[in-house]
From Swiss-Prot:
Enzyme Commission (EC) number: 2.1.1.10
Residue ranges constituting the Hcy-binding domain according to the UniProt record: 12-333
Gene Ontology terms for molecular function: S-methylmethionine-homocysteine S-methyltransferase activity; zinc ion binding
PROSITE patterns for this protein: HCY (PS50970)
Function: Catalyzes methyl transfer from S-methylmethionine (SMM) to adenosyl-L-homocysteine (AdoMet). SMM degradation (by HMT-1, HMT-2 and HMT-3) and biosynthesis (by MMT1) constitute the SMM cycle in plants, which is probably required to achieve short term control of AdoMet level.
Annotated residues for binding of Zn(2+): 251, 318-319
Cofactor(s) this protein requires: Zn(2+)
Protein name: Homocysteine S-methyltransferase 3
Keywords, comma-separated and alphabetical: Amino-acid biosynthesis, Metal-binding, Methionine biosynthesis, Methyltransferase, S-adenosyl-L-methionine, Transferase, Zinc
Root EC class: transferase
Catalytic activity: S-methyl-L-methionine + L-homocysteine = 2 L-methionine + H(+)
Note: In contrast to HMT-1, it is not inhibited by methionine.
Domain of life of the organism encoding this protein: Eukaryota
Length: 347
């Protein structure tokens, strides 16, 4: 499936960015878009529930982001765990098939989009630049805390009984399946502690995973991940992993991103990916979003040039961002000169 899977793992992202003109656009928030289209995701599976009940809505959201200018679309598998599906009454085999299906749906959306480009049957502001533009599919892996659905994905505190081996055993089969699903890369997202990053890195090595990955951490203060580990120390785990082709930050307030990019740029030459939240804060205990006093969607987009100048190469949105956000990011980047003449990282 993946048109870039055959390339050398270490060069996939730098080659892809070159084809995109130096910068690439990642998609945006998924769950809130599913809700906007009528999905009921009040469930421990969250957006992954729609892989069972409403796969057509998953396709719709992917298409919305592709038509907004995204170069990378992320599967609806963030909360899709074998353990979570089994808890809902599915068999292990059915759960594994849903993981594969999350990737298939994304590829189907990409093909629909490409066909629309060819036929000219769609209305998109950047049509002249969009036809057969490079598009990667990233298979999402959420944290152990996302499966627990108890707010611990936002605290990184899993308890003393959860060791690195516990986390490796939990994630192993899901990573194996997604690595063989045809996805172009695996996106390990919203990593809330160093221990889980180490577990992911070990799994990629132990299972001889042969597709690239990115590690994206979350931060509440612009310095540390939720568990309290330094973001830089966590990122060093990713930087030392040969499969990791980009390192970044997601599910974080926009106001912290610039300083985090500078910190990451000082310790890695790998491309940096940033896809922050809209600026609202999630209350994991009460399961609701709290509106930010100081940031709007316009403020979010106004940061993009600053993030680019600080050293980031891939830009998107996480929770509560929309296709409009991504369209605005794509517009900012398309208005900039090509990055081809700028220093290339990871070489």
């Amino acid at each position: 499936m993946g048109s870039f899977v055959k390339e050398e793992t270490s060069s996939l992202m730098t080659d892809f960015l070159e084809k995109c003109g130096g910068y690439a656009v990642v998609d945006g928030g998924f769950a809130t878009e599913l809700q906007r289209h009528g999905a009921d995701i009040n469930d421990p599976l969250w957006s992954a529930k729609c892989l069972i009940t409403s796969p057509h809505l998953v396709t719709k959201v992917h298409l919305d982001y592709l038509e907004s200018g995204a170069n990378i679309i992320i599967t609806a598998s963030y909360q899709a765990t074998i353990q979570g599906f089994v808890a809902k009454g599915l068999s292990v085999g059915e759960a594994e098939n849903l993981l594969r299906r999350s990737v298939e749906i994304t590829y189907e959306a990409r093909e629909i989009f490409y066909n629309r480009c060819t036929k000219g049957s769609w209305d998109f502001a950047y049509a002249g630049k969009a036809s057969r533009r490079p598009i990667l599919v990233a298979a999402s892996v959420g944290s152990y805390g996302a499966y627990l659905a108890d707010g611990s994905e936002y605290s990184g505190i899993y308890g003393d009984s959860v060791s690195k081996e516990t986390l490796k055993d939990f994630h192993r089969r899901r990573v194996q399946i997604l690595a063989k699903s045809g996805a172009d890369l695996i996106a390990f997202e919203t990593i809330p502690n160093k221990l889980e990053a180490e577990a992911y890195a070990d799994l990629l090595e132990e299972e001889d995973i042969d597709i690239p990955a990115w590690f994206s951490f979350t931060s509440k203060d612009g310095v540390s991940v939720p568990r309290g580990d330094s973001v830089v120390e966590c990122a060093k785990v990713a930087d030392s992993c040969k499969n990791v082709v980009a390192i970044g930050i997601n599910c974080t307030a926009p106001r912290y991103i610039h300083a985090l990019i500078i910190s990451l740029r000082q310790m890695t030459r790998k491309p940096i990916v940033v896809y922050p939240n809209s600026g609202e804060v999630y209350d994991g205990l009460n399961k609701k979003w709290i509106k930010s006093e100081g940031e709007s969607e316009e403020d979010f987009v106004s940061y993009v040039s600053k993030w680019r100048d600080a050293g980031a190469s891939l830009f998107g949105g996480c929770c509560r961002t929309t296709p409009n956000t991504i369209r605005a990011i794509a517009k900012v980047l398309s208005d900039e000169p090509s990055a081809a003449s700028k220093p290339k990282f990871g070489q």
